């Protein structure tokens, strides 16, 4: 009986990934479309990344995940983005959107407030947030699914942790660090969001 239930749950996970993957790929497609346009205009859009402690850098909190330095930068971000976004979407689209908003806004604002001067761009901070969310959510809400997702993140993406340390002048390690920390906050607050969202839907019924 337990084996049959587990098999059914695994099949549900597989079907959910199949359903969600096209939408995740569309999001990745937006990144590529933005980058092609940015390349066409000589990467002028990169000035609209997060510029720390400058008012003109505040919009970059929203736009920086869409901007990349070159096609290699985008390619090596898009692969983990698709994988981790698919895994996170298994918790449902409301949770996915909530986590994404928290990571982008909180991680981006911390980068704007505390990072080095320059224009901080790239989706890697968002990716780091997804990674840390999937890791610690297994602690806050343990289940076979959350534990499996955490193990996958550790096994295949454990080296991500090195990204929070200064390794290259061109790499925004601050963005990686604050994205990771924002993911922790999103994971901790996510159960409260889920309760509030359920109550909201119930009140509209």
Please place each PLM-identified region on the residue numbering.
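A detector for small-residue-rich transmembrane helices and their helix-helix packing motifs
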Residues: 3-205
């Amino acid at each position: 009986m337990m084996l049959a239930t587990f098999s059914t749950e695994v099949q549900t996970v597989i079907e959910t990934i199949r359903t969600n993957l096209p939408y995740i790929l569309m999001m990745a497609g937006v990144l590529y479309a933005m980058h092609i346009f940015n390349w066409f205009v000589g990467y002028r859009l990169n000035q609209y990344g997060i510029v720390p402690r400058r008012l003109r850098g505040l919009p970059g909190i929203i736009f920086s995940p869409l901007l990349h330095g070159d096609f290699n930068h985008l390619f090596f971000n898009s692969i983990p983005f698709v994988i981790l976004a698919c895994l996170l979407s298994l918790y449902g689209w409301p949770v996915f959107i909530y986590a994404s908003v928290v990571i982008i806004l909180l991680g981006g604002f911390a980068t704007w407030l505390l990072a080095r001067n320059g224009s901080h761009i790239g989706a890697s901070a968002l990716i780091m947030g997804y990674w840390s969310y999937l890791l610690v959510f297994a602690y806050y809400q343990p289940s076979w699914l959350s534990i499996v997702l955490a193990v996958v993140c550790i096994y295949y993406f454990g080296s991500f942790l090195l990204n929070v340390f200064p390794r290259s002048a061109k790499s925004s390690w601050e963005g990686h660090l604050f994205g990771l920390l924002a993911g922790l906050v999103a994971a901790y607050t996510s159960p409260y969001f889920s309760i509030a969202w359920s109550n909201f839907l119930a009140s509209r019924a």
